[in-house]
């Protein structure tokens, strides 16, 4: 079972990881998915892909620097999301659900550890 999808689809404090840079990047991802859901076009998809790649890299660097034990599992989830974006089929509901559940399950595991 997943977490409720916010409507409107915006970041709220329930997604806070307490790492300012990560929270700011998560806000950008929410915005990117919101815009893609409103207008599924190549530009919006490209911008979401760019922001996602940057965020995942930044998060992974933080995890590696702190020798976070859940790094491999976390990176695998990131890789799967990127694969889905690279083979985009226009399912913005899938992207919305993935981000909400990823933050609240996978990302929350590193709170206070990286």
UniProtKB/Swiss-Prot annotation:
Transmembrane segments: none
Residues holding Fe cation 2: 59, 74, 78, 102, 107
Function (record text): Hemerythrin is a respiratory protein in blood cells of certain marine worms. The oxygen-binding site in each chain contains two iron atoms.
Stored InterPro entries: Haemerythrin, Haemerythrin_Fe_BS, Hemerythrin, Hemerythrin-like, Hemerythrin-like_sf, Hemerythrin_metal-bd
Family under the similarity heading: Belongs to the hemerythrin family.
Lineage top rank: taxon: Eukaryota
Keyword Iron: yes
GO molecular function, one term: oxygen carrier activity
A Pfam family this chain is assigned to: Hemerythrin
Keywords for the protein's UniProt record, in alphabetical order: Iron, Metal-binding, Oxygen transport, Transport
SUPFAM superfamilies xrefs: Hemerythrin-like
Lineage per the UniProt record: Eukaryota, Metazoa, Spiralia, Lophotrochozoa, Annelida
Name of the protein in its database record: Hemerythrin subunit 1
UniProt keyword annotation of Membrane present: no
Binding site residues for Fe cation 1: 26, 55, 59, 107
């Amino acid at each position: 079972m997943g977490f409720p999808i916010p409507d409107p689809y915006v970041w709220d404090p329930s997604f806070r990881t307490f790492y300012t840079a990560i929270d700011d990047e998560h806000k950008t991802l929410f915005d990117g998915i919101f815009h893609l859901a409103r207008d599924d076009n190549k530009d919006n998809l490209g911008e979401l892909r760019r922001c996602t790649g940057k965020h995942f890299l930044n998060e992974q660097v933080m995890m590696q620097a702190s020798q976070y034990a859940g790094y491999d599992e976390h990176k695998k989830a990131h890789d799967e999301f990127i694969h889905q974006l690279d083979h985009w089929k226009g399912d913005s509901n899938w992207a919305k659900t993935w981000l909400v559940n990823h933050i609240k399950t996978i990302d929350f595991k590193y709170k206070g550890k990286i």
